[in-house]
UniProtKB/Swiss-Prot annotation:
SUPFAM superfamilies: Translation proteins SH3-like domain. One of its GO terms (cellular component) is ribonucleoprotein complex. InterPro entries: KOW (IPR005824), Rib_uL2_dom2 (IPR014722), Ribosomal_uL24 (IPR003256), Ribosomal_uL24_CS (IPR005825), Ribosomal_uL24_KOW (IPR041988), Translation_prot_SH3-like_sf (IPR008991). It comes from Xanthobacter autotrophicus (strain ATCC BAA-1158 / Py2). HAMAP family: Ribosomal_uL24_B (MF_01326_B). CDD domains: KOW_RPL26. Part of the 50S ribosomal subunit. The gene is rplX. This is Large ribosomal subunit protein uL24. One of its GO terms (biological process) is translation. The keyword Ribosomal protein applies. One of its GO terms (molecular function) is structural constituent of ribosome.
């Protein structure tokens, strides 16, 4: 199945404590059906001290379920579903169902 959400996409969180927040996808994990989104789902982790890194509590992004995010429409930034369209030259591009705008280049 073709990837509807890719690294670098602007996405909107649909559910959870970060509902309505937008961010850029840092990493997609298709086998786990999860994605890392910059600035969303921040958790605190206790870091053990090592020779080159000091210990303490650090904040970092945790993966979020792909079903809980939607691609932001390039036109107005609202969440949209993703469709696919084949151009005349045979290339397949992602299209926002909401506005019909192309998501890929």
């Amino acid at each position: 199945m073709a990837a509807k959400i890719k690294k670098g996409d602007k996405v909107v969180v649909l559910t959870g404590r970060d509902k309505g927040r937008t961010g850029e996808v840092i990493q997609v994990m298709p086998k786990e059906e999860r994605a890392l989104v910059r600035g969303v789902n921040i958790v605190k982790r206790h870091q053990r001290q090592t020779a080159n890194q000091e210990g303490g509590i650090i904040s970092k992004e945790a993966p979020i379920q792909l079903s809980n995010v939607a691609v932001a429409d390039p036109k107005d930034g609202k969440p949209t579903r993703v469709g696919f369209q084949v151009l005349e030259d045979g290339t397949k591009v992602r299209v926002a169902k909401r506005s019909g705008e192309r998501i890929d280049g």
